[in-house]
């Protein structure tokens, strides 16, 4: 009987050690690789320390944000306050795109940013959706004028993160979108709701340009933000990861799309995480600005982190305001959790 008890205890310990629990949340070192800290307020870095997170704050050329120069200033201020758990990506604009020397000016800016410690750059969807050249044509990411800039980044051993295109929902009417966070975003940002702008490049145009861009630069360390705008089907995303060994993706603001797919086929989504465990990076797209309420942002960030942890480590029945219907947590193995929450960020962004 004593031997049976010992064996059962060993089996129980082995099973529990193969997976994390919800209670392990604060014990595990984690990284959120997609934050926007556009303020000097330390609220989110303080929450990160409490929840055992390190952060990557991402500068980006967005009209709604302060300038990329001010974003970098905030990033460096935040890093000075929290040097052990915060790093950053820089960005550039397409101002003066058609002028002689545009690439040289961008490279000069990037050189300064890299000397300050930037781990790479972020490209945004205004490439392909907003910026036009002097001939009134949309500037797509595979345009050869980007090549010297990208080659410089590669030579510096830095990472290219890119939000190119949008969720496939962007080309649907609001009532046909699959997740509520997309429905809310495009209702509030009709300028980016491509269903309303059929004269703009199509979803396929955006994805094809991105694919040509990645194919053109096989030595580029590339992270497709937001599941690489292939959030609608993990099998479709898997095809790109198979084709491009230099590509990983973050999950920022697209975990609801994974949960939506989990409702109908949990095994498919879970197996995708296991099969591509080296290419998937945890991120939220959370942030703070100068007009934010720091206490509210801190609380929201903690709640987001907890809800995501439950989805990945447990097999509980869960709900989300972003998804219509219940879904079951994925209960991923411990080694997969370690990769998506920490090790992949270190590999793909060279985070410390």
Q: What do the PLM-derived regions correspond to, one by one?
A:
Residues 198, 202-212, 217-352:
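H/E-rich (His + Asp/Glu) clusters that bind or coordinate divalent metals
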Residues 51-54, 85, 132-134, 168-198, ...:
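Active-site gating loops and adjacent loop-to-helix segments of metal-dependent hydrolytic enzymes
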Residues 1-7:
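Sec-dependent signal peptide recognition
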């Amino acid at each position: 009987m004593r031997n049976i008890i010992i064996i059962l205890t060993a089996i129980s310990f082995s099973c529990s050690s193969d997976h994390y629990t919800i209670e392990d949340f604060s014990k595990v070192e984690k990284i959120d690789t997609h934050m926007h800290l556009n303020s000097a307020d330390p609220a989110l870095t303080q929450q990160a320390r409490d929840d055992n997170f390190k952060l990557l704050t991402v500068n980006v050329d967005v009209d709604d944000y302060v300038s990329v120069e001010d974003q970098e200033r905030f990033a460096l201020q935040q890093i000075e306050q929290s040097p052990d758990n915060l790093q950053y990506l820089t960005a550039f604009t397409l101002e003066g795109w058609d002028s002689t020397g545009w690439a040289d000016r961008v490279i000069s800016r990037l050189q300064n940013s890299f000397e300050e410690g930037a781990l790479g750059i972020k490209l945004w969807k205004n490439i392909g959706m907003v910026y036009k050249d002097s001939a009134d044509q949309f500037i797509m990411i595979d345009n050869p004028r980007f090549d010297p800039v990208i080659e410089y980044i590669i030579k510096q051993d830095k990472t290219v993160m890119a939000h190119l295109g949008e969720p496939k929902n962007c080309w649907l009417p609001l009532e046909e979108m699959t997740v509520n966070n997309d429905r809310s975003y495009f209702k509030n940002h009709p300028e980016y709701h491509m269903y309303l702008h059929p004269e703009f490049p199509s979803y396929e145009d955006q994805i094809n340009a991105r694919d040509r861009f990645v194919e053109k630069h096989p030595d580029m360390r590339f992270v497709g933000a937001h599941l690489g705008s292939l959030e609608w089907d993990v099998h479709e995303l898997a095809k790109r990861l198979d084709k491009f060994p230099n590509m990983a993706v973050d999950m920022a603001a697209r975990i609801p799309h994974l949960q939506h797919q989990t409702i109908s086929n949990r095994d498919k989504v879970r197996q995708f995480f296991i099969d591509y465990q080296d290419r998937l990076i945890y991120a939220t797209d959370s942030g703070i600005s100068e007009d934010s309420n720091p206490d509210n942002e801190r609380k929201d960030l903690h709640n987001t982190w907890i809800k995501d942890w439950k989805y990945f480590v447990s097999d509980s029945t869960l709900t989300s305001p972003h998804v219509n219907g219940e879904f079951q947590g994925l209960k991923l193995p411990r080694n997969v959790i370690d990769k998506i929450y920490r090790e992949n960020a270190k590999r793909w962004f060279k985070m410390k």
